[in-house]
Amino acid sequence: MKFDVIVIGGGHAGIEAALASARMGMKTLMITILAEQIGAASCNPAIGGLAKGHLVKEIDALGGQMGLTTDKTGIQFRILNASKGPAVRGSRAQIDMDRYRIMMRTIVLNTPNLEVRQEMVDRLLIKGDAVVGVETNLKNVYHAKKVIVTTGTFLRGLIHIGEIKQEAGRAGEFASNALSDSLKSLGLRLGRLKTGTCARIDAKTIDFSRMEVQPGDENPIPFSFRTDRKRFNPTQLPCYITYTNERTHEIIESNFHRAPLFTGQIEGVGPRYCPSIEDKIYRFRDKERHHIFVEPQTLEATEYYINGMSTSLPPDVQLEMIRSVKGLEHAEVVRYGYAIEYDFVDPTQLKHTLETKSIKNLYCAGQINGTTGYEEAAAQGLMAGINAALAIKEQEPLILGRDEAYIGVLIDDLVTKGTKEPYRMFTSRAEFRLLLREDNADLRLMPYGHKLGLVDEETYMKMIRKKEQIEKGLDLLKNSFITPNKETLELLSSLEEGKITDKTALVNVVARPTFTMEKLEVLVPEIQEFSEEAKEQILIEAKYHQYIQMQKEQIEKMHELMNVKIPEDLDIDAISGLSNEVKEKLKAHKPPTLFAASQISGITPAAIEILHIYIKMHQKRRVTK
């Protein structure tokens, strides 16, 4: 059978890739090992978080599905870092894992142009230097113009629970060994990574009265720009907080000799920022306790996820350490935690479109590219699906810049710097994070989503109206002035704001740390009729207008550098002043521009200056010939 696009895998990356492709008119096939598990959340029952919430909002602004499904299946919504600046705030939701999976599966199966097959892809079919289709374990052959690999942890997946090892892509599901061999046979460099998950506890056996309650926000904010914020009133369940203690640490330390992480049984590199509990105890011996978040997995709350206790220790040790924790003294484990090793593709072998450099029409997205997290996977899947469809339509690819989106930062980091450990998104990775906030993701990216046909007209026009209100409000603040007369001073005093001594632009008054939304509505009554989202934007943009302007100027300088193309026929070896290491990296990565070169790990500013000089010399020689 012939398709436009084949997506291998039905996880978070696979779903977004398949939906984007099908919604853009491509005849799409999703091949997945177990159709019932489309959209399954393999690890924690949550979407979003610091920087991850940004990704979900950006996915939504481009027309992706994750945010909307989270809003419909979420059972707790919180804004993390709410007391900090807007650039580092992050939306997070606990999801009902069952309903999330069922909803995603239903959406996939009901989407026009999208078919699903429950099979396992064993081999990629190659003609010349391009992929042309796949062969499955059932010996079925499917041809396609593009193939997107979104296999998650399934490539040679190996589960570890103490001394027990089991080939699996996820607990209870087959590993994909043949496809890993197929990728390797095509000359792609594969590495080995490791991640893990926590035990799930029977709710009946937990004493919640001995734990701290962590409720959701009183006025929850949805992820999706398509969700009606005024009517958003989800049923929310609390999470709970408890802590490890000295006894917990003793149990774990006395069983290091049984931990696959320390016995040499596990070879893959684990996530630095989400270590297992045994790794935490080993690395942070000075810590007297560690947070444990007890999170409901479904609305019925029959099982709880013990977040913070990811482990591959044997079952008897897991039970003992869990029962040493306050509130879990009588806990019964429904599912034990485990570690899983899996193959990944070195992402420096990919273009910014996520197409492989050496094999045409083959794309990789998600954990196969070395990332960790549902949100990072979904973002890559969406971009791979979009770019595969655009390539078939013979249209320009969508490559988001580091100044446009966290998705742009994510992909640029992967394809230029690569990763030796599971890559997780942080706000600190974004140079222009004050411009890349959650609250303005729609303004930044929805024009792309609308142009692609992934965002409907009604949603797009809602964004346009919001944008117009923001521009009108900021224009008022920047071009309206107040003078220190009696009326003005009385107004400021009534708002509990300090005096002004000179003629002052309203924007500078609003920029004060003490200035709130309520005060803004008094000072500028015209904005009272604006939407809540627009008013929030006006307040943020006004408060940080000087810093925002500085970042915009930095971006202009970056664009000048970005536009300097590196000629394909430039002889890198002939450039004196560059170290051999820099030359090797430039030849290996083949960056198209100076900016791309500057993002490669180990390429110094001095090397960029030298390269810039030689490019100018190269261009002059061309002109004189």
UniProtKB/Swiss-Prot annotation:
Protein residues bound to NAD(+): 270-284
Cofactor: FAD
Localisation: Cytoplasm
Gene3D superfamilies: FAD/NAD(P)-binding domain (3.50.50.60), GidA associated domain, C-terminal subdomain (1.10.150.570), tRNA uridine 5-carboxymethylaminomethyl modification enzyme MnmG/GidA (1.10.10.1800)
Taxonomy, superkingdom: Bacteria
Entry annotated with the keyword Flavoprotein: yes
Name of protein: tRNA uridine 5-carboxymethylaminomethyl modification enzyme MnmG
Family designation: Belongs to the MnmG family.
Binding locations of FAD: G9, G10, G11, H12, A13, G14, V121, S176, Q367
Gene symbol of the encoding locus: mnmG
Pfam families reported for this sequence: GIDA (PF01134), GIDA_C_1st (PF21680), SAM_GIDA_C (PF13932)
GO annotation, cellular component aspect: cytosol
InterPro entries membership: FAD/NAD-bd_sf, GIDA_C_N, MnmG, MnmG-rel, MnmG-rel_CS, MnmG_C, MnmG_C_subdom, MnmG_C_subdom_sf
The UniProt record lists the keyword NAD: yes
Function: NAD-binding protein involved in the addition of a carboxymethylaminomethyl (cmnm) group at the wobble position (U34) of certain tRNAs, forming tRNA-cmnm(5)s(2)U34.
SS bonds (residue pairs): none
GO biological process: tRNA methylation; tRNA wobble uridine modification
Subunit structure: Homodimer. Heterotetramer of two MnmE and two MnmG subunits.
Example GO molecular function: flavin adenine dinucleotide binding
UniProt entry keywords in alphabetical sequence: Cytoplasm, FAD, Flavoprotein, NAD, tRNA processing
Alphabetical list of SUPFAM superfamilies matching this protein: FAD/NAD(P)-binding domain
